C-alpha cells in the first residue's frame, strides 16, 4: 500500500524585521533600544522593537506611551512600509529559488513546503540553513527557521532559537514535544484563551489532549476542534502559495442603543486602535478603512474610505471622524 511521505515544512521568521531594517540602514540606531511604530506622544503602538528594547520589557502592540515610560532613552521611529515591502520581496525571491510552495504570512514570515526538494541530501534542515544564509548575504538581515512535518510545529520551532537560529522537530519528537509544550506557547492561543484554559486545568499539550472534541467545542466553539487536532499531533493544513490576510477587524455590541456622539466617537477610536494593533502584530499594511453600523432592527450601514497612502494611526483616526 502506498502512503504519502511525511511532509517537510519550513517556517522562516525574520528577526525583529522592521527594527532590524532601521538598524541596518542607520548605524546610529545599532545596539540601542529602537522602537518602530507610533511616537511616544501619540496614541500609537509599538509595531516592533529591537532586541535591546525587548531586553527591558518592551514588546509589540504595547502603547508607545508605555514603552517610553519603560525606557525614556529608547529611539522612536515611524515605519517605512515601502522599504519593508521591497525587502520582503527580495526575501520571497530567495524562497522561490528553492520551491514554488511558499505561503507568505506577513511581510517578514512565510511557510515553505520542501517535501519534494531533492537538494541538500533531502535534508530540510540543511536547506533551511542555506536559505537563511542567502537571506543574510542579500539583505544583511538575519532570519530564524523552524523545520518540522507540519505548519504548527514549524511555526513553534522557528521561535525556539531566535534570533538567527534554527530548530528542527522530527516526527519522532513531535508527539512528546506537544505533550510537554506549555499551553501559552501554542500558536494561536493568546492570553485570554490561556487564562480560560488554566481555569479548566489545562496547562500543557498533554492536558489539552485529555479533553474530548465535544468538551473543547463546548468551551471554545469551532476553534476548539482545531485545538483538539493540534493536541493529537494532527495538522494537515497545506502550504498555500499567495495566501495573504485580506482584512482585519474588530467590533463592539452595546447592551442598549446609544446616541451620545462623544461616546460613539470614543468607541470607534478604541476599535480603530484595536484593529490597527492587529495590523501591527501581523506586520501588514492597509489602504482602506471601513466602518459598519448595525441598528436594533438589524439594518446595517457601511462606509469606506481608501487612502492615497498606507493607513497610519493618525490617518485612520481622522478618517473615522470623517466617516462618522
Give residue spans per PLM region.
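DNA-contacting surface of Y-family translesion DNA polymerases
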Residues: 4, 11, 185, 193-321
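Gly/Gly-Pro- and Ser/Thr-rich, intrinsically disordered tail segments characteristic of DNA damage-repair
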Residues: 1-219, 223-225, 239
Amino acid at each position: 500500500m502506498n502512503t504519502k511521505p511525511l511532509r517537510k515544512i519550513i517556517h522562516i521568521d525574520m528577526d525583529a524585521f522592521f527594527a532590524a531594517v532601521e538598524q541596518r540602514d542607520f548605524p546610529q540606531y545599532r545596539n540601542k533600544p529602537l522602537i518602530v511604530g507610533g511616537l511616544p506622544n501619540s496614541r500609537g503602538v509599538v509595531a516592533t522593537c529591537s532586541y535591546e528594547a525587548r531586553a527591558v520589557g518592551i514588546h509589540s502592540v504595547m502603547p508607545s506611551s508605555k514603552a517610553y515610560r519603560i525606557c525614556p532613552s529608547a529611539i522612536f521611529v515611524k515605519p517605512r512600509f515601502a522599504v519593508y515591502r521591497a525587502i520582503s520581496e527580495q526575501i520571497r525571491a530567495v524562497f522561490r529559488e528553492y520551491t514554488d510552495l511558499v505561503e507568505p504570512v506577513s511581510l517578514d514570515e512565510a511557510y515553505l513546503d520542501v517535501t519534494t526538494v531533492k537538494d541538500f541530501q533531502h535534508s530540510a534542515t540543511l536547506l533551511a540553513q542555506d536559505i537563511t544564509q542567502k537571506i543574510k548575504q542579500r539583505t544583511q538581515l538575519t532570519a530564524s527557521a523552524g523545520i518540522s512535518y507540519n505548519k504548527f510545529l514549524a511555526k513553534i520551532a522557528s521561535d525556539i532559537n531566535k534570533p538567527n537560529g534554527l530548530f528542527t522537530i522530527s516526527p519522532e519528537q513531535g508527539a512528546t514535544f506537544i505533550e510537554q509544550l506549555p499551553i501559552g506557547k501554542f500558536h494561536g492561543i493568546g492570553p485570554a484563551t490561556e487564562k480560560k484554559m488554566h481555569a479548566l486545568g489545562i496547562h500543557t499539550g498533554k492536558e489539552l489532549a485529555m479533553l474530548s472534541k465535544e468538551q473543547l467545542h463546548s468551551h471554545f466553539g469551532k476553534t476548539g476542534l482545531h485545538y483538539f487536532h493540534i493536541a493529537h499531533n494532527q495538522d494537515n493544513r497545506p502550504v498555500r502559495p499567495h495566501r495573504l490576510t485580506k482584512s482585519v477587524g474588530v467590533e463592539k455590541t452595546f447592551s442598549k442603543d446609544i446616541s451620545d456622539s462623544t461616546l460613539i466617537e470614543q468607541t470607534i477610536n478604541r476599535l480603530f486602535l484595536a484593529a490597527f494593533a492587529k495590523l501591527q502584530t501581523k506586520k501588514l499594511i492597509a489602504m482602506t478603512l471601513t466602518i459598519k453600523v448595525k441598528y436594533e432592527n438589524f439594518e446595517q450601514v457601511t462606509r469606506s474610505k481608501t487612502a492615497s497612502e498606507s493607513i497610519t494611526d493618525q490617518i485612520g483616526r481622522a478618517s473615522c471622524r470623517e466617516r462618522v
